[in-house]
């Protein structure tokens, strides 16, 4: 009998990085479809523009580093970075903002650290935060859902506005965003926060047309439920683990419930927190980034809970309406510390 001796590892996982990235990309399709339904073709244009910009930026740096283009570009990480940034940008934001944010995410936040596997911060969230801080007005100007908007721009109109600032008929972005009386150009989270700071009671704010009698704002609850469906698909396939999404959502739900029970006139309800903004996109597609999140099971629970707490604090007391991007980046800083204190004990070690 012949015994063959091979080097470790003795168990192999056949899943390649490119396949995992593609599965995550496919899981975003339900959310993207719902965003298109409520917010129009501009969302699709921004996503496509961000993906092309991400791939071009990645190819440029790979060429400059004299690395094999096919293997590095074929891991689909740049595609996913562009997609996640594209879905986060308002549908009619200028094209150059998308290109700038995506290039910063890929070149500075990813490749400057050495490429995939070496970046300490989530590249898509770095690009988003850079745009949000640099261009706060453009980054918080969302179209009202098409169902209550006076004019719903078609595909050609969306292209004209994104690349030229006006539609073919001469309508500007401001005119398209006007919608109907009482409809602002902000998201439900932004509308609520701004109204509270102005002294309006919560009940009066939630009666505005942008909420449309929905649990978390017209359109936004369905967007979040669609991303939840995509996230459950990833969990069922074993592409991501449950620890981070569950701890994030549970912590956010607990904190928001306590705040709402104590002062419902000042704090959003837990359903509003869970089904508005980037909650479900963050829970299943952003926080679960294997490079920038914790690597131990206990650490993943701590990481998710920390992000959930930070999101609630930023939404409730901070200057920005959502807070998912800032919370993720702040938690990324703590990952080495979390992993250090939650690493499994070595067998036979005291």
From Swiss-Prot:
InterPro entries: NqrB/RnfD (IPR004338), RnfD_bac (IPR011303). Keywords: Cell inner membrane, Cell membrane, Electron transport, Flavoprotein, FMN, Membrane, Phosphoprotein, Translocase, Transmembrane, Transmembrane helix, Transport. Its cofactor is FMN. The chain crosses the membrane at residues 20-39, 89-109, 123-143, 215-235, 244-264, 267-287, 301-321, 322-342. Its main location: membrane. It comes from the Bacteria. The keyword Cell inner membrane applies. The modification FMN phosphoryl threonine is found at residue 187. Its EC number is 7.-.-.-. GO terms for biological process: electron transport chain; transmembrane transport. It is found in: Cell inner membrane. One of its GO terms (cellular component) is plasma membrane. It is a multi-pass membrane protein. Belongs to the NqrB/RnfD family. The complex is composed of six subunits: RnfA, RnfB, RnfC, RnfD, RnfE and RnfG. Part of a membrane-bound complex that couples electron transfer with translocation of ions across the membrane. This is Ion-translocating oxidoreductase complex subunit D. It comes from Cronobacter sakazakii (strain ATCC BAA-894) (Enterobacter sakazakii).
